[in-house]
Amino acid sequence: MAKIKAVILVIPENFGKHFTYQALIHSDRAVLIGVKNEPETQEQVDNLKALVDNVLDPVRELIERKVYPHSGFRSEMINKIVGGSINPPSQHMKGEAADVTFKLNEGETYLSVAEKIRESKIPVDQCIVEKRGQSQWLHLSH
């Protein structure tokens, strides 16, 4: 008989000033195929919280507008499906990265916002403009 392993994760009630836990684990792809996309370890949850506190909330305040996470945490399955890095593991799988979009002001580009973030004191280790077709977003990690 297989042993069942129970893991209890502590999810902070107030996950951030501008972001919710649910927004950071939501995956349209996971919903579409009917699988869960949730952290399995407390370390992943803690990393997501640190990402919000140290990067996402400060970026939201720096650019003074809503920031929409489109790909925060990714389970191993979702990461494989979307073509994320496996070796080394994607920072999304560790809870250390999020792909975000926001409304651009007139004359602004994702590149100019990325430069503004890099010049700030926000501790990002990656601030990358990514694009697919006409869509663009920022990959932010901590």
What kind of feature is each model-predicted range?
Residues 89-92, 102-142:
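Catalytic cores and adjacent binding grooves of peptidoglycan-active enzymes
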Residues 67, 98, 137-138:
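A broad, low-specificity signal marking well-ordered, structured residues that form hydrophobic/aromatic
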Residues 76-98:
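Short, surface-exposed glycine/acidic/tryptophan-bearing loops
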Residues 1-62, 133:
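Extracytoplasmic cell-surface/polysaccharide-interacting catalytic and binding patches
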Residues 40, 69-74, 109-115:
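N-terminal start-of-chain detector that recognizes signal peptides
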